Each structure stands twice: as structure tokens, then as C-alpha cells.
Amino acid sequence: MNGNEFGRLFRMTTYGESHGEAMGCTVSGVPAGVELSEEEIQKDLDRRKPGQSMITTSRGEPDKVTINSGIQDGYTTGTPIGMVIQNKDARSGKYEPFITAPRPSHGDYTYSAKFGTRNWGGGGRSSARETVNWVAAGGVAKQVLEQSDYDVQIKAHVCQIGDVEAGPVTFEDMLEHSEENEVRCADPEAAEEMRDVADQHQKEGDSIGGAIYFECRGVPSGLGAPRFDSFPSRLGQAMYSIPAVNDFEYGIGREARTTKGSEYTENWEFDEDGHPTPVGNDHGGIQGGITTGQPIYGEVSWHAPVSIPKTQETVDWETGEGKEITVTGRHDPVLPPRAVPVVEAMLACTVLDFMLLGGRINPDRLDGRPGEYDTDYHPSSPQNDPEDADTHAKTIDDD
């Protein structure tokens, strides 16, 4: 199975199934000298983990991360970083009825059609549980960005559940208020209504869709490449890879379809530092597929979860007959509240990858951070002076 990697220089490779022993990922391309905190990664994993509230799945996973390679004395060494998260509450028995009877609108049939087999416990690799790896990798990316010379800030919040939409909020509102309620919406009044909508659908044995607004500040201009490596095309790949996502837009998004060119065009002016900057930001910080230096923003939308305890019609390919099934596992009635850290993680991974590719961050080690050894060439040093070679060799032997 291909497609388990994301990124070019900052590269995440993941493994694990929903009801297997563990989830895990390897992150390569992290510069040496980054002070990496397992606790900071855990904070984001705690925001994503199940069982947080009555509107999330009741699966009891602590999602504790263990870093098992790539760091020494709290700092990255430049080698691949390995992270493992154990599955503690897997219950595959409830999925046995679906071994030969695919659940509607899941990956059960399509995985079987492609590979001739599949891990049927909880959907295996197709489960959204796999995003726990993405959040762990994103936690690494965030720390690299925070310790770089750029003040990159990333934040997201739930902007819609069902028909309830949040009012306008600022970046500061998201930083201060999005974690104050279980919906993760920075608009407190809308959050209460969203909570009621999710709760009502859950009581009815149903589910509902929603959307997340994201914003990234501090990204320099010049990231991205024309055409197939443009910033939005790579960011779109990241967001569409998230399970159940069915729409991604940046800038004013779909509003651009009804906006006149004279209104959508952004003129240029000099900012207070004398740098060219667009007037306005309907383009979401991107022009010609390359970043302008303005905030990058947009929305990601989810369809309603399709694992619901209502009777559904399917077929049994073993008996060749139709069959009624009920999905009785533990599932979320709405996805965006737990997906906020997933969106932030994939945005962080994308931004860091582009900054490494563009040379904005040293891919070997963070600039300005002293290494353990001085690697500069000094002609007068013993190892480069033939007359001192014997003395130097004796010193090594004595050690």
C-alpha cells in the first residue's frame, strides 16, 4: 500500500490500524538543535483524543505519545524521529458483521476491491484514528516553526455545525476562546447552539456535518512553486487527506465565483517597512500559487459521519444477497470539534515543508544554535597540522 507519506523535506510516514496494537509515525527532515517537548505534542493529542465530551466517541484512548528516536538530551539530532501511540481500547468484535457486508459510504468495499483484503476492525487504515499520527507529526512541525527566525502562528476553530454558523472572530479570539467550550468555537453564543445541534442528532441516532476555519500568520512571501507544487495545491492535498473532508477553500473561497474582477483584484502598496504588500487579502495570502507574506486563511468542510446506529441497506458478497446492518460501534456525531488539531497539524507540516524547501529554515540545523562540535575548518588545528599529528594521535589514544 502506497500513500502513507506526506511531505518532501519534512516528511511524515505513518503506520497502524484503528484496532491494531499501536499507531505510529516517523518524521524525517527535522533540523538538528530543535528543543523538542513531548509534553507540547501531548497537548495537541489531548485535544484530538476520543472521550472528551458527550459529543465525541466514548472510545477510551489516552493517546499517550512516546518518542523513541531522533532526540538526545531534549534536542533533535537531525535523524528521523519515531513516535508511538498505543491503542488501549480496541474492540474489534462489533465489526465482524461487516467482514463480508461493507458498511455504506465507508472504505470497506473500495479497500477490498483494490487490495483483495483489508483490516476490518474499525476500518483499519481507513479509520480517522490514523490522524493521531498526523497530530503528533504536526506537534513536531509547530515546535520547529516556533523556534525558527519566523514568528509563525497557526490557529483554527469550528466555524459551523449543521446550519449554525459562527459570527466573525479575530485571530486573537481564536487564541483566547476556541478551547473554552467542547465544540472548539471561538464564538461563545454560536458554540452553545452548535452543541445543541450535535447533541440532538446524537439522540436521534444520527450525525451532522460542519466546517473549520484556519489561519496562519508569519509565513514569509515566496513559498510555493508554479503549477503542480503551488502552495494551495499542496495545502489542498493535506486537507483533502483528512477523512470525511469534502470541501477545501482558501481566501474568500466560493465567494470569488460571484465577485467582480474589479473587486477581487488586490492593488499593491508599500508597508511601514518599505516592503510591497497587497491592499486587502481576499486571496488568502496566496497569489500565483505562491505566498505573499499576508495571513493564509480558509475553511475545511466535513460531511456527516456515516457510522450511525440506524438501519442501513448493504449486500453480502459471500451469500450474494441483500442485508440490513446497524453500525453499533463508538462513533462521533460530528467531526470538526476533534479535527481542529488535525487541521492545525497538517497546516504546520505544509508550511514547514515549504520553508525547508525554500531555504527559509536551515534543513541541517537551526541557524544560530551552536553544535556540540565546531565543524568549521581551522588550518591551525592539530588534526590539520602534520607537525602536530603525533601529539593529536597520542591524545586520542590516551582517551
Curated annotation (Swiss-Prot):
User: What spans are recorded as compositionally biased (Basic and acidic residues)?
Assistant: 363-377, 389-399
Q: So which cofactors does this thing need?
A: FMNH2
**Cross-referenced SUPFAM superfamilies, in alphabetical order?**
Chorismate synthase, AroC
Positions contributing to NADP(+) binding: 48
Q: Which GO terms describe its biological process?
A: amino acid biosynthetic process; aromatic amino acid family biosynthetic process; chorismate biosynthetic process
Task: For this UniProt record, give its keywords in alphabetical order, as a comma-separated list.
Answer: Amino-acid biosynthesis, Aromatic amino acid biosynthesis, FAD, Flavoprotein, FMN, Lyase, NADP
Which amino acid positions bind FMN, per UniProt? 125-127, 288, 303-307, 330
The family database entries (HAMAP family) matched by this protein are listed as:
Chorismate_synth
Mind telling me what this protein is named?
Chorismate synthase
**What is the organism field in this record?**
Haloarcula marismortui (strain ATCC 43049 / DSM 3752 / JCM 8966 / VKM B-1809) (Halobacterium marismortui)
Give the lineage.
Archaea, Methanobacteriati, Methanobacteriota, Stenosarchaea group, Halobacteria
The gene coding this protein: aroC
